[in-house]
From Swiss-Prot:
Belongs to the universal ribosomal protein uS7 family. The gene is rpsG. It comes from Nitrosomonas eutropha (strain DSM 101675 / C91 / Nm57). Pfam families: Ribosomal_S7. One of the primary rRNA binding proteins, it binds directly to 16S rRNA where it nucleates assembly of the head domain of the 30S subunit. Is located at the subunit interface close to the decoding center, probably blocks exit of the E-site tRNA. This is Small ribosomal subunit protein uS7. GO terms for biological process: translation. Part of the 30S ribosomal subunit. Contacts proteins S9 and S11. The keyword Ribosomal protein applies. GO terms for molecular function: rRNA binding; structural constituent of ribosome; tRNA binding. Keywords: Ribonucleoprotein, Ribosomal protein, RNA-binding, rRNA-binding, tRNA-binding. GO terms for cellular component: small ribosomal subunit.
Amino acid sequence: MPRRREVPKREILPDPKYHNVELAKFVNVLMTRGKKSIAEQIIYGALSHVEKKSGKDPVEVFTQALSNIRPVVEVKSRRVGGANYQVPVEVRSVRRSALAMRWLRDAARKRSEKSMDLRLAGELLEASENRGTAIKKREEVHRMAESNKAFSHFRF
């Protein structure tokens, strides 16, 4: 634990086009090598593809996809008497969003479409309908927590 004062959370401003804070955070997650404008182009392109394909509000599809991907529980390793146990713990709300965004990004990168905005659009549409690789990742994490429920008394 750090002995200094607690570092204040930075306030993230909403994105310029849709005025959504979660979208602005996702831009930062998607960004590589500090190229924020390219990350914004990819996301806005993906959202326009989502609007064309589904006919729904793209920001609503994005928030629905994120809420479907967010994990409720995860496992943490805990060493007890020479054995490592996978202990299920509840995920804090900030970490839920961060994990969901990371899993969405990784799932989109693994897809086979030609450009990143098409990949992201496809993954967003699938995740909003509870399908896709990112949802599989969440289910896998939940399954691990469920199978290790017996060790939940080893609290942190």
